[in-house]
């Protein structure tokens, strides 16, 4: 996909995203009730070599669409975060993050609560890829209890505003539930925007690429980009590395450049990556240097299992209904049950 052809994509989103957030006050009060039993949510959380109920320095990894936690991170941030001194933990909402994003979020919220308690009430970082970033921001927006438990958010290729490239799948009625929700202008992304979720809630770094073949628009290095959050540290790879630098959706997670930015974010005293920690000399699109040869091979093929899962996974012909707590923020949008009302 050529960069020039993507430039016009930004115009599509311009009518969907205002220059400033529409609502600045986040939802407050008690968390919404989970739709899933706690035992089911607990079963979706795993820590490397530790129990979530007793874990030292955890980092929560939230995977992308079409994958489990290990499929997203075995070849990259599970070993890399271990090298940085963390105990990696991850969620794997079934099936392969293809279900309702709101349900996927419940797995993350439950995991944060468990890991916070299991580490002695210590805040923890959350690191995400693709839909995982949307899940994290949805959770921080609508589940107030976790805001004080999350130390920082490092999001690789998040689609906070969805992607215009999901539209053709929706039109053919061959989209998974979460793909419907990740379409630009969906009820879910509208609710996130209107609830104040396009502004960082915890210290946040977003790393993304103009040449992403899955999430667009990402070309403007501005609030029009799907991965951009107000007040966040927004790092478009091409803004640092130049317009000819190419990393795809997977490379936004696995590349050496992504590792340097992510490492800075995790080490920073502010919770955001520091511009002084990365530059043109770090602009290597290949998998991170500190990975083994086997991990580098797996990282380079990261999208293959995701694509296979999406093709074989559940399909439906409409966007899942919003949970009651989110409906007031997307009045007038259409979901499976019809037009959203408060």
Swiss-Prot record:
GO BP, sorted A to Z: lipid catabolic process
What species is given as this protein's source? Pseudozyma antarctica
Broad enzyme group: hydrolase
Propiece residue ranges: 19-25
Q: What is this protein called?
A: Lipase B
Gene3D superfamilies from the UniProt entry: alpha/beta hydrolase
**Catalytic residues, chain numbering:** 130, 212, 249
Q: List the disulfide bonds.
A: 47-89, 241-283, 318-336
Quote the function comment for this protein.
Hydrolysis of triglycerides. Is very stereospecific both in hydrolysis and in organic synthesis and has a potentially important application in glucolipid synthesis.
**Secretion signal span:** 1-18
InterPro entries with a match to the protein in the record: AB_hydrolase_fold, Stereospecific_Lipase
Q: Which residues are glycosylated?
A: 99
Give the keywords, sorted. Cleavage on pair of basic residues, Disulfide bond, Glycoprotein, Hydrolase, Lipid degradation, Lipid metabolism, Signal, Zymogen
Q: What is the lineage of its organism?
A: Eukaryota, Fungi, Dikarya, Basidiomycota, Ustilaginomycotina
Q: Which reaction does it catalyse?
A: a triacylglycerol + H2O = a diacylglycerol + a fatty acid + H(+)
Lipid metabolism listed as a keyword: yes
């Amino acid at each position: 996909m050529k960069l020039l052809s993507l430039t016009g994509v930004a115009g599509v989103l311009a009518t969907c995203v205002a220059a400033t957030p529409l609502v600045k006050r986040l939802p407050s009060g008690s968390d919404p009730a989970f739709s899933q039993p706690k035992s089911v949510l607990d079963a979706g959380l795993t820590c490397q070599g530790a129990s979530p109920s007793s874990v030292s320095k955890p980092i929560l990894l939230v995977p992308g669409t079409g994958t489990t936690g290990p499929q997203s991170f075995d070849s990259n941030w599970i070993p890399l975060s271990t090298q940085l001194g963390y105990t990696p933990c991850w969620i794997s909402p079934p099936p392969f993050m293809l279900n309702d994003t709101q349900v996927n979020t419940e797995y993350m919220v439950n995991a944060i609560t468990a890991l916070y308690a299991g580490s002695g009430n210590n805040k923890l970082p959350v690191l995400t890829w693709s839909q995982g970033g949307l899940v994290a921001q949805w959770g921080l927006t609508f589940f107030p209890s976790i805001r004080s438990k999350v130390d920082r958010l490092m999001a690789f290729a998040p689609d906070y505003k969805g992607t215009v490239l999901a539209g053709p799948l929706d039109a053919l009625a061959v989209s998974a539930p979460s793909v419907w929700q990740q379409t630009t202008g969906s009820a879910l992304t509208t609710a996130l925007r209107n609830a104040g979720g396009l502004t960082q809630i915890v210290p946040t770094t977003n790393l993304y690429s103009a040449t992403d073949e899955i999430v667009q628009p990402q070309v403007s290095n501005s609030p029009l980009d799907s991965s951009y959050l107000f007040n966040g540290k927004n790092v478009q790879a091409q803004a640092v590395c130049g317009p000819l630098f190419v990393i795809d959706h997977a490379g936004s997670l696995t590349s050496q450049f992504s590792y340097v930015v992510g490492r800075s974010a995790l080490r920073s005293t502010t919770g955001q990556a520091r511009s002084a920690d990365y530059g043109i000399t770090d602009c290597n699109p290949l998998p991170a240097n500190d990975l083994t040869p086997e991990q580098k091979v797996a990282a380079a093929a990261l999208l293959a299992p995701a694509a296979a899962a999406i093709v074989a996974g559940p399909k439906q012909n409409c966007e899942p209904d919003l949970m009651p707590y989110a409906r007031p923020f997307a009045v007038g949008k259409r979901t499976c049950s019809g037009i959203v009302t408060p």
